[in-house]
Amino acid sequence: MRKLVLTAALALGLAVPASADLPTGAQAPLFTTQAALAGQEYGFNLRSALAKGPVVLYFYPKAFTKGCTLEANAFAEAMPEFKALGATVVGLSNDDIETLKRFSTEECRDAFAVGVASRRIVETYDVALVRNGQDTGFTSRTSYVIAQSGEIVMVHSDLDYRD
């Protein structure tokens, strides 16, 4: 399951081939965005999060859809493992902050933050969901595991939330 792969990548520092344009070994683009944790809005800053330890950025298409809800539930269940590794997990989508505040409580179970994936973030992380050559306005289901140094150590991109 994907959560075990991500946990292993954090623990072992493994590099895994990526299907996204940001390759393993690249520096993760820094950003700030609106986010929600346990229903409370705050400003997420990747630089600040990395100062505390590794970060798992996971992009998902849309809050409260079947796949995204199940993926959020899986991350929430795996949070003890991520916390044991000192990792921060944050989910990003292009949903508005009010939707994310609800999602952070109802589906993320107050266990991790979710943030607004601005157009700039979507472009710099190369996570626009494109179908038939057209940008859908959603993000792809892509996860980046970022070491505390800012280096991307794993990329996983697959619309099937079960991977």
Where are these regions (language model features)?
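N-proximal helix/coil linker or "cap" segments that precede and/or mark the start of modular domains
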Residues: V5, A9-A36
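Short, internal strand/loop/helix patches
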Residues: V90, S104-S140
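Aromatic-flanked redox-active Cys/Sec active sites in thiol-based oxidoreductases
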Residues: Y58-F64, N94
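A short beta-strand-turn-helix
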Residues: T32-P54
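Short loop/turn microsegments at loop-to-beta-strand junctions
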Residues: P29, P54, S140-T142
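Thiol-/selenol-based redox modules, centered on thioredoxin-like
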Residues: G137-D163
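Hydrophobic beta-strand anchors of alpha/beta hydrolase catalytic cores
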Residues: V56-L57, V89
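Structural microenvironment flanking redox-active thiols in thiol-disulfide oxidoreductases
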Residues: T69-D110, I121
